[in-house]
Design a protein with these regions (language model features):
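Structural microenvironment flanking redox-active thiols in thiol-disulfide oxidoreductases
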Residues: 37-88, 102-103
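Loop/turn elements at helix/coil->beta-strand transitions in domains of secreted/extracellular proteins
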Residues: 20-24, 58-63, 90-93, 120-121
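Thiol-/selenol-based redox modules, centered on thioredoxin-like
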Residues: 117-175
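Mature N-terminal segment immediately following signal peptide/propeptide cleavage
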Residues: 1-20
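Short, thiol/selenol-centered motifs that function as redox-active sites or metal-ligating centers
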Residues: 30-47, 75, 115, 167-171, ...
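Short, internal strand/loop/helix patches
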Residues: 82-118
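Short active-site neighborhood of thiol/selenol oxidoreductases, capturing the structured segment around
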Residues: 14-45, 149
Length: 175
């Protein structure tokens, strides 16, 4: 958690810099995935980032977006494009560049978006999707991440704590 990453807001930050008293939420994201930015038929998840960030702040939980799309770094996921996208979307939270997809590989992140929620002791307590709006067969809407934040705030166990991550694959550099 001490590795330093280039940030669209500051020169560089580590996950330790961002973590707060009650934990840390890491969301692997990017600038182009339809699951992140949306389509005509699907709203995408990035419009939820700022409200979730504010909810996490109130619960004293750190919140960060990570772009690990090293395979697209020369184009749509370049650091300059990340800065432009963060400004366009008015991101309030840090948006970090994961060079060579090192963090994504270490955390076994698969998709954008992919959520990892760590408690105050750095234990993974929740991972997967932000919610279930992608599932056309859902019986009811479930806001997984906001429910997890609320559970931590209320001193309760996070349920469900592991859900399927839906999104675009992280574009790693082939070796």
């Amino acid at each position: 958690m001490d590795k330093v990453f280039p940030s669209t807001q500051e020169s560089s930050l580590s996950l330790t810099d961002i973590k707060k008293e009650n934990g840390l939420i890491v969301i692997f994201s990017c600038n182009t995935c339809p699951f992140v930015v949306g389509t005509e038929d699907f709203p995408g998840w990035e419009n939820q980032y700022n409200p979730l960030y504010n909810m996490a702040l109130k619960a004293n939980i750190g919140f960060v977006l990570i772009n690990s799309n090293e395979g697209k770094r020369a184009g749509v996921d370049s650091f300059e494009e990340m800065k432009s996208h963060a400004k366009k979307m008015s991101y309030q939270m840090p948006y970090l560049m994961d060079e060579n997809s090192e963090l994504a590989n270490a955390m076994e992140a698969k998709t954008t978006p992919h959520v990892f929620f760590f408690d105050k002791n750095n234990k993974l307590i929740c991972a997967g999707s932000i919610d279930n709006i992608w599932d056309n067969k859902r019986k009811k809407d479930e806001q997984y991440l906001s429910m997890a934040i609320q559970s931590v705030l209320n001193g309760k166990k996070v349920k469900p704590n592991f859900t399927a991550a839906k999104g675009c694959s992280i574009k790693r550099v082939s070796k």
